[in-house]
Amino acid sequence: MPYKFTFDLSVVPHKFFKELAYMVDSKRIHKRTGRILRRLIDRFKLSELTGMDFAEILQVIEDLVDIQVKNLAYRQRFEMSKNKALFLPHCARKYVDSRCRAEFDPDVPTFRCRRCSPDCQVNQASRIAEELGYDVYIVPGGSCIPKIIKKHNYDGIVGVACGEEIRLAYTYLNEDIAAQAVPLIKNGCSNTVFSIDSLCKILQSQKI
């Protein structure tokens, strides 16, 4: 959890994210366009909804914009990639104790989902990705990802993580890898949350 604060954007109206995505897709916004972001934050009363300081919510939203911009930049190459993997954070499991039946493989390292909870986001995401032909890794941390990518020569990857971890990941991905990212909308050490709908749109995007 690289952020020095916790956040929960699951309370934010879906309309906010739709408007943010539209502004990025139509090239009407850039990460440094703080004035536009400040207006959006004020209009949707995000500080009041989330209980976060304005500076904290601004940092998170700036990271969301940066992720969306990078997704757009790499989208075409990602759609054409053939050997793909999905990396999920283990903290998004419904349970992070013995109630979770996932088996940990230290040689990879990854958790192997045993499908114990139908309403678990990791269960849902991994099932969808595997049906689409992705290799799936439920990782204990980001430091193991470069080794996995190198070993299997993936040319397209999808990562789910908090915005700051995603930003750090771009620093060790080489130019031969087309990456797409889905940011957490609720961070923390457990019970983190991401948008299954956003992930599915990325997973299903490919050139035939």
Task: Pin down the residues of each PLM region.
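Redox- and metal-dependent alpha/beta enzyme cores, enriched for Fe-S-associated oxidoreductases
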Residues: 79-132
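Ser/Thr/Gly-rich flexible loops in soluble cytosolic domains mediating phosphotransfer, phosphorylation
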Residues: 113-114, 180-208
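General beta-strand structural signal in soluble alpha/beta enzymes
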Residues: 137-140, 159, 181
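Proline-aspartate-enriched helix->loop->beta-strand connector
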Residues: 153-154
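Gly/Ser/Thr-rich loops at beta-strand to alpha-helix junctions
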Residues: 90-94, 118, 142-145, 159-167, ...
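Electropositive, gly/pro-rich neighborhoods at or near active sites that engage anionic ligands
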Residues: 1-93
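A short acidic (Asp/Glu
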Residues: 98-99, 148-150, 167-171
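A short, gly/pro- and small-residue-rich
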Residues: 106-108, 169-186
